[in-house]
A protein has these predicted regions:
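Mid-chain, structured segments of secreted extracytoplasmic proteins
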Residues: 63-112
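Solenoidal tandem-repeat scaffolds enriched in leucines and small polar residues
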Residues: 162-183
């Protein structure tokens, strides 16, 4: 896990120096870093208020609301589409942040109007936040980190026989480092960890749900697309450049139903809030 540890240290040092918050973690060797969660909000303003209350920063690239936390962007709309169905019951069961002190952050968030659920079995080092339209966010604690909050993980729920296959697929496709956490398979990528847990029943694909897809930012879109196509992965749609944001994007879908955006991101513009 030396690569993942080094990336985490570089990421932390970049943020503690106080440089612009709107930066993902440094790219890995193939030019990939954790990118975003794309929420198709039924109530954009409610979600904006929630994430601002948790310490997020708001940008408006191309006139679209984009929240930023260390290690992750969160898109709050997708044109005129509205998602149906929360994360639970889909292959991406939940996503996660890690904070320096759960109880202190929970108190601050509640004061800002963020609804917070207790941890499992009333654990004091864990909590949950759920968006108004059902995106479940796990909150964990690392008292050694120097920032109040950062992105930590995306948690996939899959049939047991598929767990090693999914781990291998994500490690190969995005240049991640395979490992284990609590005896469960994981893949470390800059800016976050992909975790894989057993589901007793087949879970629904993400497309069309409130968390419609996850995304990876890339340094060289053409090179990454060439790599994954050579590995037999078919693009869901042709590569295109957004006329409003300047981003270069395409989508793929993993073998288990997670929609994934691959994006080379243009500058975000000024911080709004």
């Amino acid at each position: 896990m030396k690569t993942a540890v080094l990336a985490a240290l570089l990421f932390t040092s970049t943020l503690t120096i106080g440089t612009v918050a709107a930066q993902p973690a440094p790219y890995n060797e193939i030019g990939v870093t954790m990118g975003h969660w794309h929420i198709i909000s039924k109530d954009v303003e409610a979600n904006k208020k929630l994430f601002l209350g948790m310490g997020g920063k708001l940008f408006m690239p191309g006139g679209n609301p984009l929240m930023m936390f260390p290690g992750i962007y969160i898109n709050l709309n997708l044109g005129t589409e509205k998602g149906d169905g929360g994360t639970q019951g889909s292959v991406v069961n939940h996503v996660g942040f890690i904070v320096d002190n759960v109880q202190e952050r929970v108190a601050q968030w509640k004061a800002a109007g963020v609804p917070v659920l207790p941890g499992n079995n009333n654990r004091l080092d864990q909590a949950f936040v759920e968006t108004p339209d059902g995106v479940r966010i796990e909150i964990l604690e690392d008292k050694t980190q120097s920032m109040p909050i950062r992105h930590e993980h995306v948690h996939f729920f899959l049939p047991e026989a598929e767990l090693p296959k999914a781990q291998a697929w994500y490690a190969k496709t995005f240049g991640g480092e395979a490992g284990t956490r609590n005896n469960a398979p994981v893949v470390d990528v800059p800016g976050g960890q992909l975790r894989f847990a057993k589901a007793d029943t087949k879970q629904a694909p993400t497309r069309g749900r409130v968390l419609d897809h996850i995304g990876f930012d890339v340094r060289d879109h053409q090179a990454v697309v060439k790599k994954i196509e050579a590995e037999g992965i078919t693009l869901d749609e042709p590569v295109r450049k957004s006329p409003t944001t300047g981003n270069t994007v395409t989508y793929i879908t993993d073998p288990w139903g997670t929609r994934i955006e691959i994006i080379e991101r243009a500058p975000l513009g000024a911080l709004v809030q």
